[in-house]
Amino acid sequence: MGRKKIQITRIMDERNRQVTFTKRKFGLMKKAYELSVLCDCEIALIIFNSTNKLFQYASTDMDKVLLKYTEYNEPHESRTNSDIVETLRKKGLNGCDSPDPDADDSVGHSPESEDKYRKINEDIDLMISRQRLCAVPPPNFEMPVSIPVSSHNSLVYSNPVSSLGNPNLLPLAHPSLQRNSMSPGVTHRPPSAGNTGGLMGGDLTSGAGTSAGNGYGNPRNSPGLLVSPGNLNKNMQAKSPPPMNLGMNNRKPDLRVLIPPGSKNTMPSVSEDVDLLLNQRINNSQSAQSLATPVVSVATPTLPGQGMGGYPSAISTTYGTEYSLSSADLSSLSGFNTASALHLGSVTGWQQQHLHSMPPSALSQLGDRTTTPSRYPQHTRHEAGRSPVDSLSSCSSSYDGSDREDHRNEFHSPIGLTRPSPDERESPSVKRMRLSEGWAT
């Protein structure tokens, strides 16, 4: 609360005049003290009030200062009230209306000075806030995410959809992102969780779309995914496997073989034969339709409530499109015998001719081989009146009538666990030759 301007005239009220004298006298002495200390000078004040009462102030000693004053004979500056009033008028201040800021130091600044300082502080705060806003860079929301893939021609697909993202980033377009295609001369192997051959890392903006089941980008998936053309829809799809009886309406079940990562070291010949079979599948394919059927993993049985029938193989939660193998393709895998007791076999037309010429003992041995492991004894017995050939060929028949339930319960033949005999352990070259002959017929 500042002081208002007062008119510099004589105060008529005795009480007010006395209070004003007391305050301003102390203020004058305070200014004299400050001046003497700051400028190293000697000051002497001699004041007589209206009642002729003496008040004096001396910076050092009054007698000494007065002695100097009496002995000083040189010209010097001497001021009176008229001189001060004239000086104030020249500076643009009216002597009668001057604010007299030095009159009372116990009171703060005047209202004008306080308003000026307040405005300056507000301007400084506004300037600092603007500088802080300009100094903060716009966030890009980039998340480096790496996904192991096995494709050799991996690419980074980024789609910055954030409004605060970097506007210089543009979505990367690639033909393989629109539709997954495989050239006949290129061999791709199904990806596994333990494969890190195609591991790439990159900073991708949020909303980087992955591929859905039909090969088109899906911008609502998790942000910053590194995808590859050959394996776009093998790693990011549905979170749980669908029921097995949904995709088996009046058509043959198309199954795909996903080799687990644990068996890659023990069965190198199976991987090579799968590559050869995939090449033959691509070269001789007449249908470009991509069927999103469940991927069946050839792995150790896990839970008895999952899987197909009595063989609870681990079903992958992805739906790839480029490695779909029909039952006719699985029939070509009948000669795959590995040291880890994995056997893929089914009976088709060209195998039935050999089965008819085989003795009954061999047929019974083949039937025993394609049944469920002894872990689930309720599925080990055959139905009355059904031969092992019928049980084996049931996977390639259409699901009609009551056979649909039987086939779902006894769906063993495409992927069965068996221990190969010594005469069946052949070299990879012999297996490859037999696959070529079987495919040609």
Swiss-Prot record:
Query: Can you list the disulfide-bonded cysteine pairs?
Result: none
Give the UniProt keywords, A-Z: Acetylation, Activator, Apoptosis, Cytoplasm, Developmental protein, Differentiation, DNA-binding, Neurogenesis, Nucleus, Phosphoprotein, Transcription, Transcription regulation
Q: Which CDD domains does this entry report, sorted A to Z?
A: MADS_MEF2_like
Ranges for region Beta domain: 271-278
Q: Which InterPro entries match?
A: HJURP_C, MEF2-like_N, TF_MADSbox, TF_MADSbox_sf
Show where the MADS-box domain sits. 1-61
Residue positions of the PTM N6-acetyllysine?
Answer: K4, K116, K119, K234, K239, K252, K264
Q: Where is the composition biased (Polar residues)?
A: 362-377
> What residues bear Phosphothreonine in this entry?
T293, T300
Which parts of the sequence carry Phosphoserine? Answer: S59, S98, S106, S110, S222, S228, S240, S387, S413
PROSITE patterns recorded: MADS_BOX_1, MADS_BOX_2
User: What is known about its processing and modification?
Assistant: Phosphorylation on Ser-59 enhances DNA binding activity.
User: GO: which molecular function terms?
Assistant: DNA binding; DNA-binding transcription activator activity, RNA polymerase II-specific; DNA-binding transcription factor activity; DNA-binding transcription factor activity, RNA polymerase II-specific; histone deacetylase binding; protein dimerization activity; RNA polymerase II cis-regulatory region sequence-specific DNA binding; RNA polymerase II transcription regulatory region sequence-specific DNA binding
UniProt site (Cleavage): D400, G401
User: Looking at the record's lineage, which domain of life comes first?
Assistant: Eukaryota
Give the range the annotation lists for the signal sequence: none
DNA-binding region(s), chain positions: 58-86
What is the recorded function of this protein according to its Swiss-Prot or TrEMBL entry? Transcription activator which binds specifically to the MEF2 element present in the regulatory regions of many muscle-specific genes. Controls cardiac morphogenesis and myogenesis, and is also involved in vascular development. Enhances transcriptional activation mediated by SOX18. Plays an essential role in hippocampal-dependent learning and memory by suppressing the number of excitatory synapses and thus regulating basal and evoked synaptic transmission. Crucial for normal neuronal development, distribution, and electrical activity in the neocortex.
What do we know about how this protein assembles, alone or with others?
Answer: Forms a complex with class II HDACs in undifferentiating cells. On myogenic differentiation, HDACs are released into the cytoplasm allowing MEF2s to interact with other proteins for activation. Interacts with EP300 in differentiating cells; the interaction acetylates MEF2C leading to increased DNA binding and activation. Interacts with HDAC7 and CARM1. Interacts with HDAC4, HDAC7 and HDAC9; the interaction with HDACs represses transcriptional activity. Interacts with LPIN1. Interacts with MYOCD. Interacts with AKAP13.
Q: What is known of its domains?
A: The beta domain is required for enhancement of transcriptional activity.
Protein name, as recorded: Myocyte-specific enhancer factor 2C
